[in-house]
Regions:
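Metal-dependent nuclease catalytic regions and adjoining charged, substrate-binding loops involved
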Residues: 159-278
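Short N-terminal secondary-structure initiator segments
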Residues: 44-69, 107-142, 262, 268-274
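Short catalytic/ligand-binding loop motif for oxyanion handling, primarily in non-cytosolic enzymes
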Residues: 8-9, 16-18, 118-121, 179-183, ...
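Metal-dependent nuclease catalytic cores that hydrolyze phosphodiester bonds in DNA/RNA
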Residues: 1-108
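Amphipathic alpha-helical segments that form well-ordered structural scaffolds
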Residues: 36-39, 155, 159, 219
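Mg2+/Mn2+-dependent nuclease catalytic core
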Residues: 76-215
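Non-catalytic, well-ordered alpha-helical scaffold segments
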Residues: 31-35, 154, 234
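Serine-centered coil/turn micro-motif
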Residues: 20, 46-47, 142-147, 235-239
């Protein structure tokens, strides 16, 4: 859980926080990348893996693969991408992007597609898409935007193992990085009804660790059973918004109570559960 307070509000109290609009371009790149791998599924390594000296990895063919990718419907059946944690009775799941079969070991590797665009104008400031790209920032005050990527890979490996598969600790992030440096534009002058964006590609290995997942589910169940909302994490944006709104509106509260509430909101401190960032 990124924030126990937000998790409780969403899962126990049914509070819906303002949503973000969908990123259709990102979704479309995921769709196209899967189609790339579908052409080689169960047969041979895709050229992107051959280029990265991973020709022993081929797209995994399984009758339930399409169900595994359906994040919205992850809990519909046991054939979807979920598992029930018996100790907490939490059905835990989501939608994965793809799976590779290691023809040398027989193990599976979880694959996560990612699309990005580095907007720095100075080419020297463009980060290389390698293992260091996924690491936490060296400055602890900087936000760790890749933490959710790493956690998701950890969780998906845990689920896949509980579904009875032999899964390697090594997962792969397949990145496409939209280019702009040195580009005049994207509209095709010979056919102005068309536009093109060029992407650089990368395959980044990540050694996952799912040892924390079961404890996190136990903590989640304990949080769900609380009668009152627990404290929010330090720096929680939702907590700050709620506290500021209460303070601005002063709804049925004295100033001293509002100040105390604002302070409180910013201090750390069978159920279906989709993998997310609450």
């Amino acid at each position: 859980m990124k924030c126990r307070g937000c998790f409780w509000l969403q899962q126990a109290a049914g509070v819906e926080f303002p949503g973000m609009p969908g990123f259709n371009l990102n979704t479309n790149t995921d769709t196209l990348l899967k189609r790339d791998l579908d052409q080689y599924r169960g047969k041979a390594a895709h050229p992107i893996f051959v280029k990265n000296k991973l020709k022993h990895l081929i797209p995994f063919e399984h009758e339930d693969l399409e169900k595994w990718t359906q994040s919205i419907h992850f809990g519909l059946s046991q054939r979807h991408f979920n598992t029930v944690h018996e100790k907490t009775n939490i059905k835990f799941g989501g939608g994965l992007d793809d799976v590779l079969l290691n023809t040398k070991t027989g193990e599976l590797h979880i694959v996560d597609y990612k699309s990005t665009a580095q907007l720095a104008r100075d080419k020297a400031k463009i980060k290389k898409l390698d293992e260091a790209f996924l690491l936490p920032p060296t400055n602890p005050k900087e936000p760790d935007y890749k933490a959710s990527y790493r956690r998701q890979m950890d969780m998906y490996q845990w689920i896949m193992r509980r579904k009875g598969f032999a899964v390697s600790d090594i997962g792969y992030f397949v990145y496409v990085d939209g280019q702009h440096i040195g580009k005049k534009g994207m509209i095709d002058e010979s056919n102005p009804n068309k536009a093109n964006m060029e992407f650089n590609t990368a395959v980044i290995p990540y050694e996952a660790d799912d040892s924390w997942v079961e404890k996190a589910l136990t903590d989640a169940k304990r949080t769900l059973t609380l009668k009152n909302c627990p404290s929010h994490a330090d720096g929680c944006e939702n907590a700050r918004f709620l506290a500021d709104a209460k303070k601005a509106l002063k709804i049925d509260m004295e100033d001293s109570q509002v100040d105390e509430y604002a302070k409180l909101m910013n201090v750390s401190g069978k159920i279906d559960y989709e993998i997310g960032e609450s």
